[in-house]
Amino acid sequence: MMKIKKKNILMLSLMALVIGFIASCSKMDVGYLRTEGASFTPDSLNVFHNIDSTSVRATDSLPFVSIRIQGVAGTNPVNYELSSVKADCPSASELFMKLYKEGKISVAGGLIVVSQDASRQLTNGRYVLSLKVYNEDHEAILKDVFTIVVTDDELPTA
């Protein structure tokens, strides 16, 4: 009888321990993501409809590319997406997002890339971008972090 009581107490204790372990287990966030102070330097990119037809950009169909964003640290892979865009008019913002979804504008590895095809379709003006930066368990929105300025002709060089 004493043996059965000890066995029952042992089983109850073991069950309580298992239930305690299961109840205390919860999903732990993987890694980290730090974006405080994240910025582009310079924080804008000039994009042109008409480029010099003899330039390397024209002959090799090279896109317009920003400098890589600085100040982002986190567990790899760290991913970047266009979160939103503000423009002078709603239709310009919609066109920008459409070109992004078509892959003619991209945010890759902290670089903003505008193809020549996209640059010819965008209307003149300023496009202020907000980016989503994320990894497995973390994300941040970098609001109004970069500006693309679209004009007809290349800026004159000194």
Task: Name each region found by the language model.
Residues 1-8, 16-42:
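Bacterial Sec-dependent N-terminal signal peptides
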Residues 26-158:
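Non-catalytic macromolecular-recognition regions in eukaryotic signaling proteins
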